[in-house]
Amino acid sequence: MMKRLIPTFNRILVQGVIQPAKTESGILLPEKASKLNSGKVIAVGPGSRDKDGKLIPVSVKEGDTVLLPEYGGTQVKLGEKEYHLFRDEDVLGTLHED
């Protein structure tokens, strides 16, 4: 049975982009360089509400590649895949191809 997680409030479900352990030329990278620091947004919550009850939407959308803090988020395992839940304000930025 396939499970689908839909985040609540201003939370974002991210699948980590695994950084390679070595460069294309064969140089081994330190373990810290391969930690989760970017990910693909899989799902987003509807947003949060301000003090007047007005909806504040999440700043990213499904499919975006985002820059994440080195620590934080909540690890979630669905089936064989691992994801992380972050709050919208924890995302450091979005990454774009030139």
UniProtKB/Swiss-Prot annotation:
Transmembrane segments: none
Subcellular location: Cytoplasm
Cytoplasm among keywords: yes
A Pfam match: Cpn10
Keyword list, A-Z: Chaperone, Cytoplasm
Predominant location category: cytoplasm
Top-level taxon: Eukaryota
MF terms in GO: ATP binding; protein folding chaperone
GO cellular-component term (any): cytoplasm
Subunit structure: Forms stable complexes with CPN60 in the presence of ATP.
Role played: Seems to function only as a co-chaperone, along with cpn60, and in certain cases is essential for the discharge of biologically active proteins from cpn60.
Family label: Belongs to the GroES chaperonin family.
Protein name per its UniProtKB record: 10 kDa chaperonin
